[in-house]
Every structure is written in C-alpha cells, then in structure tokens.
Amino acid sequence: QIVDVQGRECSDFQAFSMCALDKGVEREIDPTTTRSLMGSIYPSPGIFSKYWTLDQEALVQIVQDTCGRHDTFGLACTARYYDDLGYPGHINCSDNMNKDLARFNIKPRGGWPAINFFFNTMLDDTNALGMDDPWSRPGDYVMLKALTDLICISTACPCDIDPANGWNPTDIQVRTYNTTENFKKSIGWRKTAEAEMEETKETGFHKSFARYTRNFIEYNGFWLANDMTNIGVVNEYWACREDAAIMDLSPLRKYEVTGPDAKRLMQKCITRDVEKFPIDRNVTTIAIIIPAIPK
C-alpha cells in the first residue's frame, strides 16, 4: 500500500521479478506492455488491473485506488531533467533508485521507466504531454497485490521546480500486509470536489452474480457484472431476444414507495397521473426533488 501522507506527492514505483533476477535477467514492469495488454493508459481495480513485464508476465495487480489519476508515460525524474532546467546536481528519483537497487545487482540507468503514482499528466490538443498539481489528497493510496516474488521500490519524488508535487515535496508511506489479509477491490470517488471519498461497493446481488463471473466493472459507485463466464456476446444477444436476461440495476438508485399514502406521495412528486399506472407492471418516470428552503 503506497500512501500519499499529506497529498499531492508523486511516487515512482517499480517491481522486479525475483525469479528472473536469480537467472541474471532484469525483468521489471514495462509501461508500454502494460498499456497494450490492458487497453488503457494505466490499470485500475477490476478486470484490467495488472502490470506486466516485457515478457508479458504479470507482476502486480492494483486492488484499491482512492486517487484515480496516475502516469505511465514519463520516466522517474532524472539528473538530465534538472540539468536542462538549470538545476544541476538536483536530487532525483532515478539516482535514488539506482543507489537502492545496487545491492540487488540491478544495473543503474540514467532514467528509470516507472509507474508514477499520483502524477497528474495529460495530453493537450497539440499532442503535447503536460502536467499539473496531483489530484491526490492527504491519505490517498493505491493498494497492490504481488502476483509473484518481487523486489519493489517506490520513491517520494523530490521535485520542487514544477507542479509534479504541488511545488512542495512531502512524504510517501509504504505499508506491507501479511498474505492472510484480504482486501476487496475498490475505487475511490467523490460526488463533488468537496465531498468525502466513497469506495466502490458491492450490490446486494453481488454474491449471486459472482457464482457465474469474475468480470465486474465499476459503474456509478458499484461493481456490476460485465458478462457471464463461457456465455459470450452472441448467446447474450439471443437470450435478450428469445429467452431471458438478468441485470443488476442497483446503481440506478431505484426506490420502492409503499404504504397507504404511497399513491398520494408519488402524485406530489411527479406530473404523470398515478391513477393510470398499471398495478402489476413496472413504470419508469422522473421525479424532480426540490429541497425545502427553511423560513
């Protein structure tokens, strides 16, 4: 678990396969392979959650992410970067990584490819790669699961000359947990910029769907089944046409209105004539709720 203690601090992460190192071969996370296999600019909790080596071996899997904004394009910051900007001799992540990895006989590099957690980069209309202050807030974290024996390294980026760390480098905390611990996959999200962070939830039907699939995707704060194992899209199509299909609509936030005054309450909330609603069928309508203003 890589924790941004005070918020807006980048951490350049890399992991090496110990099995490969024992054979004298360096095989670490390769960002390009990862993007190609996952089909996204960086993995996230769910079905497309793994980081891969150049040999297409999965090393780690992201289980939880409360920030949701990272980078896989840039190197860990280098001496050359600071030299070019007029800060020769500035401490940098690549040199720090070289020093710590030397004891494992890992060869030094002028710039390390890395997973730059909490690094806020974007592509503009001219295809230029830019950066801005990180989105991470105090206590935000990513949780990773090792898929094999690894040597891992994670930095607290010392950059203080651009927005990478909000112009103020702070601490990164790394926690490790026993293999007996079990963490549910989740993505942190906020309804508004000022709202408290909420984690992705399982619906009341999750266990029933989990008997038939492991492919769950995040939607509107919930994990929903994306497909059923060994069924396929063609069979799903014909099931919708000729047989039956089941969907979990929990994220739509539907409610049941019951009781002797249910009809009167509904008539106050909507413009449709409730008396014309069929008793034994579902009805879709929209209610606009306006909060009362205290006098």
Model-derived segments and spans:
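Acidic, Ser/Thr/Pro
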Residues: 1-189
